């Protein structure tokens, strides 16, 4: 059976079979068989192709790894777990964002602790100046989802107020061509803070502030699916969100 996922990935990337073969140092006919006959490459070749095309190895060849192997690899994506967000070292946030060379993604309701940190906002500006694409998703302050989250945390209208305050702190960033901020109307189960292949994921626990909920530090690795799950979630929310008006 043909590997349509691999074929589509090549088309979307604008890459030819010959170019893939040359890049990973195999015969072009070998790559063609991977596509037309569904042959599964060796692990090192799967990794090289996935990296070249910018997609997940597990997406291109989902049958290549057993569930146990996928689970074992995904476990290595967990760098550490903090019992509470306040237990994350203060400088860890700045170091995470400063490490970005390609993209920074943030999915929150207000993320006010980030917006109020002048040092981190400066890091955002510096990274944007360096060509890093920054996407921020804030809760729509007029949405029922934000209103309910405010009730759940016991601050009622305070959640919407925090979002509006965060926008004030981001005023200068919003004018940068590499920064885009959107409003979402999503029931969040996690807040996501991403810099390239690293993520800090803050779970949301009913009846408590996000600052008191656990945080996972993840690093995406080839063959793992945990980090990819959160990144796909971010993209889904982004696609449904609306740009914040200037």
Protein language model features and the residues they cover:
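A short, Lys/Arg-rich alpha-helix, primarily the initiator
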Residues: 1-19, 23
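Key DNA-contact positions within bacterial/archaeal DNA-binding proteins
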Residues: 18, 29, 58
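Recognition helix of helix-turn-helix/homeodomain-like DNA-binding domains
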Residues: 25-41, 63
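Short, basic-rich loop-to-helix N-cap that marks the start of a DNA-contacting helix
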Residues: 37-51
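Short C-terminal boundary/hinge segments that cap the last helix of small helical domains
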Residues: 54-69
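PLD-like (HKD) phosphodiesterase/transphosphatidyltransferase domain
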Residues: 69-146, 231-236, 243
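HKD-type phospholipase D/PLD-like phosphodiesterase module
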Residues: 140, 146-190
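HKD (HxKxxxxD) catalytic microenvironment of the phospholipase D
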Residues: 179-218
């Amino acid at each position: 059976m043909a590997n349509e996922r691999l074929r589509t990935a090549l088309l979307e990337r604008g890459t030819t079979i010959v170019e893939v073969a040359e890049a990973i140092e195999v015969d072009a006919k070998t790559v063609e068989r991977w596509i037309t006959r569904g042959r599964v490459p060796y692990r090192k070749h799967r990794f090289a192709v996935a990296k070249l095309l910018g997609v997940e190895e597990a997406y291109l060849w989902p049958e290549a790894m057993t569930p146990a192997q996928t689970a074992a690899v995904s476990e290595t994506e967990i760098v550490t777990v903090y019992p509470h967000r306040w237990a994350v070292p203060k400088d860890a946030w700045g170091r995470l964002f400063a490490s970005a060379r390609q993209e920074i993604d943030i999915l929150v309701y207000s993320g006010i602790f980030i917006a109020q940190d002048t040092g981190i906002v400066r890091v955002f500006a510096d990274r944007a100046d360096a060509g890093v694409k920054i996407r921020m998703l804030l809760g729509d302050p007029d949405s029922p989802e934000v209103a309910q989250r405010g009730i759940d945390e016991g601050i009622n209208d305070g959640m919407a107020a925090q979002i509006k305050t965060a926008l004030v702190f981001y005023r200068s960033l919003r004018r940068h061509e590499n920064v885009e901020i959107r409003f979402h109307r999503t029931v969040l189960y996690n807040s996501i803070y991403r810099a390239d292949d690293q993520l800090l994921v803050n779970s949301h626990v009913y009846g408590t502030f996000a600052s008191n909920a656990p945080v996972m530090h993840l690093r995406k690795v080839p063959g793992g699916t945990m980090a990819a799950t959160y990144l796909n979630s971010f993209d889904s929310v982004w696609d449904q969100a609306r740009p914040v008006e200037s």
